[in-house]
Amino acid sequence: FFNDVGQAAGYYPRAESLFDACPSIRATVQSLFGADNQNIWFLGYEVFHKRAGAGRHTPFHQDASFAPFHGKHLVRFWIPFERTPKSHCLEVIGGSHRGPLFNPNKILMTDPATHAADGVDDTTPCFDKEEELRAMPRLPDILADPEAYDVLSWDLDPGDAVAFHLASLHGNAPVDARHPERNTLILGFFGDDCIY
């Protein structure tokens, strides 16, 4: 398992360079944000490389629960480098971006490699002070009862993208012998209504 994170500060104050290289990104982000949004900024990127045996299902979580900014104009694109079947793709809980914001997973926040172990509780709260527990409810155990949730996933080809709001509950299906490797690029953008 490998993860690289790059933040936009200093080298992409606005997304112009990225938009010049791939103009369809601007149109897609603008269509998601709506006509009332005037500006689009590049939030940052992540690169994930995951091989079979290097991890199990990435726990469901919301990126917004540990981000220092909020708003409706927040989107991430999950882009695979190889054909990725639905059974091994990103999984998003439909409508979960509408709330509530859950307490992030402690294991995922403190030691992502640990979540490879079987028997790890994927819902253990990261923020455990009494006021934090009241403000942010514990994550639901989606994997224990996936039929109770609107779990969305897709068959994707290289260059396809899944767009999701930072408050969407999402996790990654595991890689295994049937799909032994997954490489993905995540691009994030934000718009006018975001506050820090």
Q: Where does each model-flagged region fall?
A:
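Short beta-strand His + acidic residue motifs that chelate non-heme Fe in jelly-roll/DSBH
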Residues: 77, 164, 170-178
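Non-heme Fe(II)-dependent double-stranded beta-helix
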Residues: 1-60, 66-68
